[in-house]
């Protein structure tokens, strides 16, 4: 019987050593060199070459080195991870496993979608290809191929992990590992991938395809060989027990410039395949109950529950052009640095109809504004997440019925959309003349059966039903009901989001009352603000050859609402641009109006002429302060408004709500927070308040200016401003 060969002791096989007498022992690896100094090291290190077991090492100890001192040196080297026990075999492959602190991976793999060359590569890596396997390798031409749904279902049934890869194409895709019952499934990944391929999704739906649009194969033998060997490497590491966060990611390798990128893949808790598809419905059924929430900041960026740095840290993982909810965050460099404007991908609030018509509109992308770059970056991120959360997914709570059959349980959409009967009658001409933001739908049919979603009334403390298509972008519904972004808001907490949504509907109502009635409003004294940022901003605008002023357009609701206006001087075109802001703190309202103006300005400075938005084209081409005198401040002293904000967001929410209710209005909040996003998102709805798009039904638009003393009698329909707000 052969005696077992004892393990040898030596430096890890990926480490080299060099003794410099009188200086140090140097340990070298791919990562660099480390100098070791201490008693007996220069004498002991040559013996640790991996050819001796402990007995041989003890026999060959140099004279003068006691065994206990030698043992102490070896212990310290072992604790540092430099030496260890191992078999006597030493080669490049075993050195690799020492370098990654593991043992050689061996196991059985099943392969789907591969050619014979793949099997050869796997066998060369020491793997056994068999149907009864520990791991499946699934190779495909496209990660959205429809057959992968069946592959995913089968692996979830058996519990076998699988690795997805696309070894073809100029850009190779590898990963993630799917482990049934733990982490995301293929459907979680597919939802994100389709979300970042909207044009292809449109083609797929238009042509009735089961999966992605077929593409011609792209391959190069050296690249394919590299890709297959990377697949084999990841499989070997997995079977060796190697685990690291990147295995949950999609890794791409671009052969054109040899760059690699990692795109995180996370489970969607509401996934119909691996999660709980009732999560969104359950949230909608619950009451919306704001709680006390002290503010963390009360600076010019707004009164918020969380600092922007924390928000960015918590939600940055959602940014990726492949697996993210947000495609990108990029600074808009077309204007001065003080503008601090960021962009964050396509604006889904346009819906498919609007996106097709407004590819170059001012609002065709999500954006963020702020006094500082971090505020603007977080604003862009949150706006994109807000838009995504407001997009129809199909798992929303819905009741199918007609308005007439629901009775008092439902809110009529006309109280929210506020189109005039003459707009319905003239809709064909109006829709041809104006952009999608001004689109006039068909008259609502009270007997038509459609989907309704419950929305919580803060005023009544109960749910009432609104048309689902009024609440979610691209939700199926009749052409009489259209969703828009008015009142959609995100925040660090629910209370934060509710307050921002309330302030937005108040702001847009105030702007509409001023704009469409064309009343002159008092100016805000910018010099008296004492804000050094505003003083610097005025200088920047002057350097651009532009005038800057701000109007107070506050309505009967008493929440400070401001309109910032800028025009170019010294030329035939004034290229007038605007920005709006509202807040209980008038200083914050002022900064918000100015930062929104800053957000709009880069496009104008870049020569934008309105793109394919006819309202913007007419405005930038024709509008001047001479033709639109309501843009100029009214004579008289500026109005000074008190700061009514408090240190707690709940108190602010309740104050704005009371002011709305005192005006005879009801406040609704729909919680649109998505489980896979986490950022609180709401839609605030106040029937009767005006959006700032051209919707001219009777109501506040005509009555409030008279009550405020701006007009002696209400304007008629034909007297309203023919220029539409295009922001």
Q: For the regions a protein language model found, what residue spans apply to each?
A:
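Long, charge-rich, low-complexity alpha-helical segments
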Residues: 23, 29-129, 164, 171-180, ...
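Short amphipathic alpha-helical segments and helix-helix/interface helices
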Residues: 74, 119, 148-156, 538, ...
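Hydrophobic beta-strand scaffold residues
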Residues: 129, 162-163, 548, 667
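E1/E1-like adenylate-forming module used to activate ubiquitin-like modifiers
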Residues: 121, 133-227, 237-242, 254-286
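Helix-biased "structured C-terminal domain" signature
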Residues: 63, 76, 259-727
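Polybasic (Lys/Arg-rich)
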Residues: 248-254
